[in-house]
Swiss-Prot record:
Lineage, highest ranks first: Bacteria, Pseudomonadati, Pseudomonadota, Gammaproteobacteria, Pasteurellales
Membrane spanning residue stretches: 71-91, 97-117
Record localization: Cell inner membrane
Topology within the bilayer: Multi-pass membrane protein
GO cellular component, one term: oxidoreductase complex
Record-linked InterPro entries: RseC, SigmaE_reg_RseC_MucC
Protein name (record): Uncharacterized protein HI_0589
UniProt-listed Pfam families: RseC_MucC (PF04246)
Tagged with keyword NADP: no
Amino acid sequence: MMSYDAETGIAKVKCQSQSTCGACSARETCGTESLSELNGKRGEHIFTLETITPLRTDQMVEIGLEEKSMLFSALLMYIVQLFTLLVATLLSSYISENELIRAILIFMLTALSFVMVKRYTRKLGQQTEFQSVLLRVLF
C-alpha cells in the first residue's frame, strides 16, 4: 500500500503483476519473456479504494474486483474493437472501391471505437461494482 488517509478512508494501492516466465521450463526458447523485457517495467497499476479498515503505509494488502466487472471489461476491450473492425471492413467495401479510402475509413472507425470505449469505461469506473475492494490485509 502506498498511502492511506484515515479521515476519508481512501487508500492508494500499487499492484504489481508478475509473469510466470521465471518458473517455466521452456523459458530459454520462448520469445515471450524477451518481449516482456522490452516493455521495461512489468505491469504496475495504482488503485484508489475506500475502506473502513485502518491501514498503514507499506502494508501488503489483497484487493479484488467483481468477476462480472472483469468479464464486462474484457468484452469492452476486445470484442467491441474486433466487431467494429469487421463492420468497418464490410462497410468500406460498399462505400468505395479505392483501397486507400477504405483503409482510412477502417482506421478512423476503429480509432473512434477505442475513444468511445475509453469514455464509457471512465463512467463505469465510478460505479461501485467496477471499483476495487479491500479483501484482506496480508501483513
